[in-house]
Amino acid sequence: MSSIKIECVLRENCHCGESPVWEEASNSLLFVDIPAKKVCRWDSLSKQVQRVTVDAPVSSVALRQSGGYVATVGTKFCALNWEDQSAVVLATVDKEKKNNRFNDGKVDPAGRYFAGTMAEETAPAVLERRQGSLYSLFPDHHVEKYFDQVDISNGLDWSMDHKIFYYIDSLSYSVDAFDYDLQTGKISNRRSVYKLEKEEQIPDGMCIDVEGKLWVACYNGGRVIRLDPETGKRLQTVKLPVDKTTSCCFGGKDYSEMYVTCARDGLDSKGLLQQPEAGGIFKITGLGVKGIPPYPYTG
């Protein structure tokens, strides 16, 4: 196995960086800074960052097959036009819950945009519980709701054979699996495939590799962990020089690099001194496994 290298490739000082997505066409990493209401695009060749500011906390971003991007902004699914920096609302959820916002989101293999909600936090991971739900935006722009009673809707991905949906509700301290129907988008038969250990802290964003193993960013745990969802065993731990690791994705050449987002919010002045790269973007190389390209939203 090659030696693992971790480097901070962008000192962005994100309040809460999230939702890293690799855009192969531009050799860029997309990500968001939720409370700053910014969608960012880092060009891995020029090292330049472009930013678009929206009108509410933006919690996830995804590629769109017809061009541009889609994002979850407040409680809205939006289409994002990068050139003129405009956001067009495609659908709105949780209209009766004024204190809610979207959190993590990702597009499924059929081109639906899955995303879940949560109550606004009063401090990191401190919030009114069971206020969230999981939704998906179909290509025809109608929305389906899967379930409610969610604390912090978070990481999500699909198995390589497209038969299992993996999902994290952070405060359950569990990675869950559902049977998944690619044709209809329906999910069923929820079960836990991994329970986090105490030092791993809070499960946050997640991605899958070509071997069908899950990578989970552990908020307050300063690490990403690799899990085997079939055996429930942890296979690997990669520790980072920041505590508040939030999400991860594969990207770069052949999707052999991992990009990890993290947060500064919640660190006191001492913590910020000890973790000067908090809020930055990290690249991990030498993992010896590749990821898969992100699916684009087809609506």
UniProtKB/Swiss-Prot annotation:
Name of the molecule in the record: Regucalcin
Cofactors required: Zn(2+); Mn(2+); Ca(2+); Mg(2+)
Organism of derivation: Bos taurus (Bovine)
Catalytic center residues: D204 (proton donor/acceptor)
GO MF term set: calcium ion binding; enzyme regulator activity; gluconolactonase activity; zinc ion binding
Summary of the function given for this chain in its UniProt record: Gluconolactonase with low activity towards other sugar lactones, including gulonolactone and galactonolactone. Catalyzes a key step in ascorbic acid (vitamin C) biosynthesis. Can also hydrolyze diisopropyl phosphorofluoridate and phenylacetate (in vitro). Calcium-binding protein. Modulates Ca(2+) signaling, and Ca(2+)-dependent cellular processes and enzyme activities.
Reactions catalysed according to its record: D-glucono-1,5-lactone + H2O = D-gluconate + H(+)
SUPFAM superfamilies: Calcium-dependent phosphotriesterase
Lineage: Eukaryota, Metazoa, Chordata, Craniata, Vertebrata
InterPro entries the UniProt entry points to: 6-blade_b-propeller_TolB-like (IPR011042), Regucalcin (IPR008367), SGL (IPR013658), SMP-30 (IPR005511)
GO biological process: intracellular calcium ion homeostasis; L-ascorbic acid biosynthetic process; positive regulation of ATP-dependent activity; regulation of calcium-mediated signaling
The record's free-text note on cofactor binding: Binds 1 divalent metal cation per subunit. Most active with Zn(2+) and Mn(2+) ions. The physiological cofactor is most likely Ca(2+) or Mg(2+).
Modified residues (N6-succinyllysine): K244, K253
One GO location term (cellular component): cytoplasm
Binding site for substrate: R101, N103, E121
Alphabetical keyword list: Ascorbate biosynthesis, Calcium, Cytoplasm, Hydrolase, Metal-binding
Family note: Belongs to the SMP-30/CGR1 family.
Subunit structure, as described in the record: Monomer.
